[in-house]
From Swiss-Prot:
Pfam families: RNase_T. It comes from Mycobacterium avium (strain 104). The keyword Nuclease applies. This is Oligoribonuclease. Belongs to the oligoribonuclease family. The lineage of its organism: Bacteria, Bacillati, Actinomycetota, Actinomycetes, Mycobacteriales. Its main location: cytoplasm. One of its GO terms (molecular function) is 3'-5'-RNA exonuclease activity.
Length: 215
């Protein structure tokens, strides 16, 4: 059974949907085991000088350091072309529309810009999303040792590199926070479900987030 995930990361001139511009989008498709399929796609989208001049100081410094501003100025790719390039790659590995969830970090922000600027791409994706940031936040509360032990991110603020880091982060959580394959037995699952139905606390590990992790 095929069960792909579509990983997307966007770089924008800011986070305001009313005024900011989408200036880079990258995509990678993985299988259910988080193996990357193909080379992916990374597209820098042209924006005019006025849009770049309107960026805040922090965003300007970030995109200058990464080299993205110079690439945006030099790019001749518009939004429609970028959307088709991303869809061409995704369709190579995800044959049926509305079957593959969107995955990434804080992915709702990226999806909002995709909905606004790339409706055909949004329509091809499943409505469900897998947000690695949600797992991060749960680990911070439930398993702080895992949270504080996660791999250091490069923070390049370039779309394709950020996707690779998000995939690596989910691989880390899978090996540390999730039950090892093949998972609990049917009887163990039934016991947890029954306990929750009865309003009881289901048995499980504890790892207080109120203090730095030990051991």
């Amino acid at each position: 059974m095929r069960d792909e995930l579509v990983w997307i990361d966007c770089e924008m001139t800011g986070l305001d949907l009313g005024s900011d511009k989408l200036i880079e989008i990258a995509a990678l498709v993985t299988d259910a085991e988080l193996n990357v399929l193909g080379d992916g796609v990374d597209v820098v989208i042209h924006a005019d000088d006025a849009a770049l001049a309107a960026m805040g100081e922090v965003v300007t410094e970030m995109h200058s350091r990464s080299g993205l501003i110079d690439e945006v100025k030099a790019s001749t790719v518009d939004l429609a072309t970028a959307e088709e390039m991303v869809l061409d790659y995704i369709r190579t590995h995800v044959k049926a529309p509305k079957t593959a969830p969107l995955a990434g970090n804080s992915i709702a922000t990226d999806r909002a810009f995709i909905v606004r600027d790339m409706p055909a791409l949004d329509s091809y994706l499943h409505y469900r999303m897998i947000d690695v940031s949600s797992i991060k936040e749960l680990c911070r509360r439930w398993y702080p040792r895992i949270y504080f032990g996660q791999p250091v991110k490069g923070l390049t603020h370039r779309a394709l590199a950020d996707i690779h880091e998000s995939i690596r982060e989910l691989q880390f959580y899978r090996r540390t926070a999730f039950v090892a394959p093949p998972g609990p037995s049917t009887s163990e699952i039934e016991a947890v479900a029954a306990a929750l139905d009865e309003g009881k606390d289901a048995p499980g590990p504890s790892d207080s987030a109120s203090a730095p992790p030990t051991g």
